[in-house]
Structure formats: structure tokens, C-alpha cells
């Protein structure tokens, strides 16, 4: 492949429209050839990426984001990126569906509609809600949280809302975005999201874990609960009474040569066991939650049993732990 074509991809953010490729010196025959042999990926009709670049993108964030950029590049009518597509541009966490869609909001569109993997939304927006991110016009973070909440429900809304609060958006800004949506479809879910959002959840798994623990019906758990014995400091993901809920991601136990984060899995397991023993030493119960637990009724019942067992053994008050508590971290929101 000619160097000027590779340079053209880099100059245009790793995506080339057919017109841009022709302007860079490619011929129609060359474009068809590179697509046919697999060196170029047709991300969208008339929009291409180099195979090596595309395959290096992860399927949950990178590829959906560039698919949205490609769809935007192929559109001739005015639009702004919105919903999941806007969240990805902002760097917010998104609970991606199995089949991701490109989302745009267009002025004057009569009714939302799905067309070749692009969902066109009709909801009006104010000029000040449009910001430029990575050279693209997108709806701002607060509006994006509200849109995802209305369109995709409480879990997806909370994941993005928690992420937005961590990024510096205030709860007041979220509330203002939702307040402008009076009588819109799904607005009650968006209001619930504003109320329940918590920047203490450090990732999507902790957000969903908080939702799971809340569903036990014993109140909202505290996030990022810290204890120390004067030498060691431990932060627990969630606390309800005297019971801690720790969110486990399997990547931290998986060897690095299998795509994980641990260079020594046995040591990682040993350190995690020592960590749990340290927590239990304060007469605190501990439950562990993994991703698969978020949608299982059986696991919800098991967590209920574990929580109630802690209550029977040690009660719910943590007044005796006052000398050992670490002041709460300063968090946005």
C-alpha cells in the first residue's frame, strides 16, 4: 500500500471516506482491491479503516466508537452524536448492549427510527447542550446521562451517571438536564438515576453491585468504606451495616499471558485472602460479587443470607469502629 494512503488514514483520524481516499491519490480499483483482500475494513458504506487498526480496537468501546464516527462521516444531514455514541466520545462508561447501535439526534426528525444500525432521535436540545469532543459535535455529559437513562433503563443509566459524576459533572447539572424533559418518555427512570447515582462506584461493576445490594431491601449501601489498624489501610467497595460487599473482576486473577492483570495468580489469590481476613478481623462480614451475579436471583438470595448472618452475629452499628475508620475520599457529585 502506498505510504500516502497510510498517511491519509492517520491524518483523518484513522477513518477515510471514499472521497478522501480518492483525494489522497487512490483509484476506485485500488479501494475495491484493498477491501477485497481484507487490508481495509468497510466500517460503513463508503467509510474505511485499516484492518490492523480496526482489529486492534476492543469490541465494547473502540469498535462501537469508530463505527459511530464512520456513520457520522457518511451522513449529510445535520446531526449531533447522542446517547451511547456521545458517552463513548466523552470517555464515559457505557453498559453496552450485545448489539450496539449508533445514536444521533437530529433537529426536525419526526419520531425516533432505526435505519441500518443508526438510531435517529427526535428529542429537541438546546444550543448550549452541544459541545465539541474530539472534533465532533456531541450532546454534553449531563444530557447524555439523561438520554441513556430514558432510552435504555436504570442499570445503563446508572453506569453512565456514576461515570459522569466521577468526571466532574454535578448532580445539579444532571437534575437540570432531566428537568427539561418533563413528560418525555422514560423521564421517571432518568429522575431515579439522578437520585441514585453515586461517584463512589469506581467502575460499571461497582455500579451494578450497588444496585444489587440495594435490591436486598435493607437500604442504600455506602461506597468506598475505609478501615485501618494504623499500619494497613483497606477500602471496601460497598458497606451495608457491618457487612462488606466486594466486587471481583476475574481479570485480576487471570495471568497476563491469557489477557489478565496478574503476573502471579497464586500470589494474587493469597493477598486477596489476607485482605479478607483483615476485614473480618474488625467483626465485619464479607460477600464477594462477580459479574454473573448481577442478573441471578439465586445469588441475590445468597447475599441476603450472608448479610443477615452478619447482622445476627454482630448487629448493624459500626460505632465501635470509629477509631479505625478512614475519612471518606473526596468525590465529585
List each language-model region with its residue ranges.
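Surface segments flanking catalytic/ligand-binding clefts of nucleic-acid enzymes
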Residues: 3, 7, 11-12, 27, ...
Amino acid at each position: 500500500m502506498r505510504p500516502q494512503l497510510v498517511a491519509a488514514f492517520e491524518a483523518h483520524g484513522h477513518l477515510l471516506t471514499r472521497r478522501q481516499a480518492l483525494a489522497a491519490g487512490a483509484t476506485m480499483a485500488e479501494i475495491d482491491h484493498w477491501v477485497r483482500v481484507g487490508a481495509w475494513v468497510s466500517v460503513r458504506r463508503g467509510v474505511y479503516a485499516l484492518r490492523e487498526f480496526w482489529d486492534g480496537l476492543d469490541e465494547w468501546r473502540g469498535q462501537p466508537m469508530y463505527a459511530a464516527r464512520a456513520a457520522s462521516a457518511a451522513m449529510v444531514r445535520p446531526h449531533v452524536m447522542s446517547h451511547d455514541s456521545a458517552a463513548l466520545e466523552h470517555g464515559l462508561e457505557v453498559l453496552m448492549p450485545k448489539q450496539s447501535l449508533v445514536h444521533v439526534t437530529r433537529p426536525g426528525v419526526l419520531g425516533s427510527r432505526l435505519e441500518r444500525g443508526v438510531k435517529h432521535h427526535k428529542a429537541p436540545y438546546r444550543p448550549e447542550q452541544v459541545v465539541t469532543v474530539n472534533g465532533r459535535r456531541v450532546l454534553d455529559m449531563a444530557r447524555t446521562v439523561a438520554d441513556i437513562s430514558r432510552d435504555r433503563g436504570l442499570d445503563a443509566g446508572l453506569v453512565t451517571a456514576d461515570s459522569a459524576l466521577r468526571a466532574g459533572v454535578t448532580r445539579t447539572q444532571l437534575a437540570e438536564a432531566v428537568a427539561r424533559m418533563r413528560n418525555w418518555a422514560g423521564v421517571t427512570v432518568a429522575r431515579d438515576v439522578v437520585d441514585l447515582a453515586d461517584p463512589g462506584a469506581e467502575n460499571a461493576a461497582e455500579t451494578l453491585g450497588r444496585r444489587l445490594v440495594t435490591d436486598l431491601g435493607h437500604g442504600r449501601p455506602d461506597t468506598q468504606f475505609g478501615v485501618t489498624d494504623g499500619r494497613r489501610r483497606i477500602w471496601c467497595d460497598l458497606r451495608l451495616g457491618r457487612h462488606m460487599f466486594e466486587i471481583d473482576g476475574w481479570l485480576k486473577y487471570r495471568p497476563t499471558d491469557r489477557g489478565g492483570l496478574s503476573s502471579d495468580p497464586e500470589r494474587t489469590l493469597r493477598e486477596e485472602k489476607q485482605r479478607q481476613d483483615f476485614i473480618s478481623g474488625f467483626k465485619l462480614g464479607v460477600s464477594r460479587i462477580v459479574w454473573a451475579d448481577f442478573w441471578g436471583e439465586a445469588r441475590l438470595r445468597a447475599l441476603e443470607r450472608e448479610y443477615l448472618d452478619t447482622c445476627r452475629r454482630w448487629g448493624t452499628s459500626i460505632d465501635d469502629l470509629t477509631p479505625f475508620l478512614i475519612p471518606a475520599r473526596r468525590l465529585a457529585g
